[in-house]
């Protein structure tokens, strides 16, 4: 079973270092969303659908049963992908489920693209 970790904004996959060390496993994959710890391709539209499709594509490449974990904006991508393609994983968890509460307040670094309708 592969563990896949998706970090948020403005982090890099280094945020998962202590957890990966504690797990003591060699089947952990740390994914960095385009533009957040990974290069942003010129033609990548950076919309919530584009990030969903990116994550689904990465999960398809792994192929093994997957336990998926998302944090912050990475957790938003996890929820979006799992609502669309739940069969891609064995289990999933996120700390970002609160984004579905109408009164949720986005932090400043993620609010710019989302709150202005760009993402």
Give each language-model segment a name.
Residues 1-39:
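Conserved HGGG/HGGXW glycine-rich cap/lid loop of the alpha/beta-hydrolase fold
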Residues 18, 80-84:
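Active-site signature of alpha/beta-hydrolase-fold catalytic machinery across serine-
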Residues 70, 74, 78:
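Gly/Ala-rich beta-loop-alpha elbow adjacent to hydrolase catalytic centers
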Residues 9-10, 72, 98-99:
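Short, flexible active-site-adjacent loop segments at beta-strand->alpha-helix junctions, enriched
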Residues 30-69, 100-102, 110:
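Active-site loop/oxyanion-hole signature of alpha/beta-hydrolase fold enzymes
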Residues 35, 74, 91:
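Conserved G/P- and acidic residue-centered "switch" motifs that form tight phosphate/ATP-binding loops
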Residues 2, 27, 64-67, 88-91:
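Structural signature of beta-strand start/N-cap positions in the alpha/beta core
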Residues 83, 90-119:
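Flexible "cap/lid" loop of the alpha/beta hydrolase fold
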């Amino acid at each position: 079973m592969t563990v896949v970790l998706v970090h948020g904004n403005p982090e890099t996959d280094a945020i998962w270092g202590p957890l990966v060390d504690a797990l003591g496993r060699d089947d952990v994959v740390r994914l960095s969303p385009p533009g957040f710890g990974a290069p942003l391709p010129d033609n990548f539209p950076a919309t919530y659908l584009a990030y969903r499709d990116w994550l689904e594509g990465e999960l398809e490449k792994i192929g093994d049963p997957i336990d998926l974990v998302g944090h912050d904006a990475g957790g938003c991508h996890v929820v979006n992908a799992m609502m669309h393609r739940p069969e891609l994983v064995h289990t999933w968890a996120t700390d970002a489920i609160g984004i579905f509460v109408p009164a949720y307040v986005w932090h400043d670094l993620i609010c710019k693209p989302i709150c202005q309708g760009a993402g």
